[in-house]
């Protein structure tokens, strides 16, 4: 917990220094981003139980873009009243699988063979 508090204090101090020496418009943008992040976190805290939040935060470390998509999906469902109660870890896993299927990327491998002036006749074994 102390590490998180230190990080929060560092961010706050950095924001104060930037506001003091930077553009006032820049500080307003940062404040808006900060408010939006707090709003997102409060909504997610209301719709996810503790184990699901832990899984989502672990996923955020590895795949932030997928986490953002899942968070947006959960927030949208909460705003339209499609969630009944808190989402459990198993429910979050199902949502993650749905998002993975929708955003599945197909990997193609293309071999580029170069023609080299090499003959096998000169090989000495």
Swiss-Prot record:
GO biological process, one term: positive regulation of apoptotic process
Highest taxon, organism lineage: Eukaryota
Coiled coil residues, start to end: none
List of residues that carry Phosphoserine: 51, 119
PANTHER family membership: PROGRAMMED CELL DEATH PROTEIN 5
Family: Belongs to the PDCD5 family.
Protein name: Programmed cell death protein 5
Native source species: Bos taurus
